């Protein structure tokens, strides 16, 4: 596994691959601190929260088909942000995921792993739904 460093930006493609991001962007936006990005998305761009619990807050940018998930104070990987967006790759759909984690290396690794697992479950569920629709059309 690629070693993570404090303040690093990672690109996670699909559900299993991790590599350091080369560009200074996060899902097509200039890379900035999670706090600054949250403020820009919610205050300047007026995007609404879709979900909030004791660990995360999620915001959807429907125009860019991107979901932004921010850790909240008290989360071990705080301050961090994860952005995910679907990408059609031929007949396959995958989730491109980027992570900016400003926590300790071990906590960043846990955060990345948690989102990899979530992405994997989401893709399995999506595949089941697609297979079910194919069966219904036969």
Residue locations for each model-derived region?
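N-terminal signal peptide c-region/cleavage motif recognized by signal peptidases
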Residues: 18-20
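C-terminal partner/receptor-binding element of secreted or periplasmic proteins
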Residues: 100-138
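N-terminal secretory signal peptides
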Residues: 23-78
């Amino acid at each position: 596994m690629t070693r993570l460093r404090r303040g690093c930006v990672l690109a996670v493609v699909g559900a299993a691959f991790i590599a350091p991001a080369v560009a200074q962007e996060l899902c097509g936006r200039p890379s900035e601190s999670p706090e600054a990005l949250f403020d820009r998305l919610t205050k300047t761009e007026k995007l609404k929260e879709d979900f909030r619990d004791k660990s995360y807050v999620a915001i959807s940018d429907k125009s860019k088909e991107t979901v932004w998930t921010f850790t909240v104070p008290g989360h071990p990987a705080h301050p961090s942000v994860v952005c995910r967006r679907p990408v059609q790759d031929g007949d396959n759909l995958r989730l491109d995921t980027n992570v900016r984690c400003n926590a300790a290396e071990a906590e960043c690794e846990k955060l990345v792993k948690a989102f990899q697992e979530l992405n994997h479950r989401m893709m399995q569920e999506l595949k089941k739904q697609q297979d079910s629709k194919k069966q219904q059309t036969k």
